[in-house]
Structures are given as structure tokens and as C-alpha cells.
């Protein structure tokens, strides 16, 4: 993918707060199931914003940084998802979201970001991303010094 969308820590916090506001009132939720690993940070932020203490994980493996591969369910909570928010950082192709819908038909599936191929599978999200754009999450990056332009020419 040639295009990149970079999400800073501040932006992630803001996006998650916006997503949390859409989930009010918080009392309707039994808990949050964060999809590992991308949904862990958004799940923690949502848990804080909504005052939810019951947080668990759904562990589905389908990516090796930038390459999609076969989907494997490593860990999954019991039940049909009723009363739970399932939190993802991104819905891309929709493959993981389809699997989550199959596993937990009564859960509310939400994500911070959505691409067109998977957006219809979500109940809520806050950021539209073009299908041909790669997202760089803040936990995948570091801040580093960049040489000023005028020094490069010497």
C-alpha cells in the first residue's frame, strides 16, 4: 500500500474518547472484549472512559505486521456476546469482523478505524480510512530526530 495514515498517541486517545461517547450509557455493558493485539490499547482506553472493569481478550491471529495470513482463534470468551463491546483498532478486509460476528452474534462490534470493505460489519466506528491506505498505529512507531532540510544540503 502506497498511502499511509499515521495515528499519534494523542489522536488515538481522542478517537477512543469519541468512540466511547457513542457507547453511552455505560451501564448497558457487562464488559469489553478487546481483540488482540490491535484492540488492546483502544479497549483499555474505552474501559477507562466508560468505567468498565470487566475486560477480557479475544485472540485472533491474522496479520504479521503488514501481511495477512490464515486466521487462527487462539482464545475466545464463552457466550454469544450479549452485553459486551468487542473492540478493534481497525476493520480492513472484514475477515476478522465476519468471524467475530459468527462467534458473537449478540455483541456490539466497534472499531476506531474502518475501511470500506469492512465498514458494513461494524456497529460503530469513528475514522474512515481508504482501502489502499496502511495505518501506522502509535504502538508500532517511535519518535526520532529528523535532520533539518538545510543541513542535508551541506
Curated annotation (Swiss-Prot):
One cellular component (GO) term of this entry: cytosol
Residues the entry annotates as binding xanthine: 92, 135
Residue sites binding 5-phospho-alpha-D-ribose 1-diphosphate per the record: 37-38, 69, 88-96
Residue stretches spanning the membrane: none
Pfam families in alphabetical order: Pribosyltran
Listed PROSITE patterns: PUR_PYR_PR_TRANSFER
Topology in the lipid bilayer: Peripheral membrane protein
Gene3D superfamilies: 3.40.50.2020
Protein's cellular compartments: Cell inner membrane
UniProt binding sites for GMP: 69, 92-96, 134-135
Enzyme Commission no: 2.4.2.-, 2.4.2.22
Binding site for guanine: 92, 135
Reactions it catalyzes: GMP + diphosphate = guanine + 5-phospho-alpha-D-ribose 1-diphosphate; XMP + diphosphate = xanthine + 5-phospho-alpha-D-ribose 1-diphosphate; IMP + diphosphate = hypoxanthine + 5-phospho-alpha-D-ribose 1-diphosphate
Stored InterPro entries: PRibTrfase_dom (IPR000836), PRTase-like (IPR029057), Xanthine_Guanine_PRibTrfase (IPR023747)
GO-annotated molecular function: guanine phosphoribosyltransferase activity; hypoxanthine phosphoribosyltransferase activity; magnesium ion binding; xanthine phosphoribosyltransferase activity
SUPFAM superfamilies: PRTase-like
Broad class of where this protein is predominantly found: membrane
Xref: HAMAP family: XGPRT
UniProt function note: Purine salvage pathway enzyme that catalyzes the transfer of the ribosyl-5-phosphate group from 5-phospho-alpha-D-ribose 1-diphosphate (PRPP) to the N9 position of the 6-oxopurines guanine and xanthine to form the corresponding ribonucleotides GMP (guanosine 5'-monophosphate) and XMP (xanthosine 5'-monophosphate), with the release of PPi. To a lesser extent, also acts on hypoxanthine.
Protein name according to UniProt: Xanthine-guanine phosphoribosyltransferase
Organism expressing this protein natively: Vibrio campbellii (strain ATCC BAA-1116)
Upper taxonomic lineage: Bacteria, Pseudomonadati, Pseudomonadota, Gammaproteobacteria, Vibrionales
Amino acid at each position: 500500500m502506497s498511502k499511509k495514515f499515521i495515528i499519534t498517541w494523542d489522536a488515538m486517545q481522542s478517537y477512543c474518547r469519541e468512540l466511547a461517547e457513542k457507547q453511552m450509557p455505560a451501564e448497558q455493558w457487562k464488559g469489553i472484549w478487546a481483540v488482540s493485539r490491535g484492540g488492546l490499547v483502544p479497549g483499555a482506553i474505552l474501559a477507562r472512559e466508560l468505567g468498565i472493569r470487566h475486560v477480557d481478550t479475544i485472540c485472533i491471529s491474522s496479520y504479521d505486521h503488514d501481511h495477512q495470513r490464515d486466521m487462527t482463534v487462539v482464545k475466545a470468551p464463552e457466550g454469544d456476546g450479549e452485553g459486551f463491546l468487542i473492540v478493534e483498532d481497525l476493520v480492513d478486509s472484514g475477515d476478522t469482523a465476519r468471524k467475530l460476528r459468527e462467534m458473537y452474534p449478540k455483541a456490539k462490534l466497534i472499531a476506531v478505524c474502518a475501511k470500506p470493505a469492512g465498514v458494513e460489519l461494524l456497529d460503530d466506528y469513528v475514522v474512515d480510512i481508504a482501502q489502499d491506505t496502511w495505518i501506522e498505529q502509535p504502538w508500532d512507531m517511535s519518535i526520532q530526530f529528523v535532520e533539518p532540510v538545510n543541513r542535508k544540503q551541506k
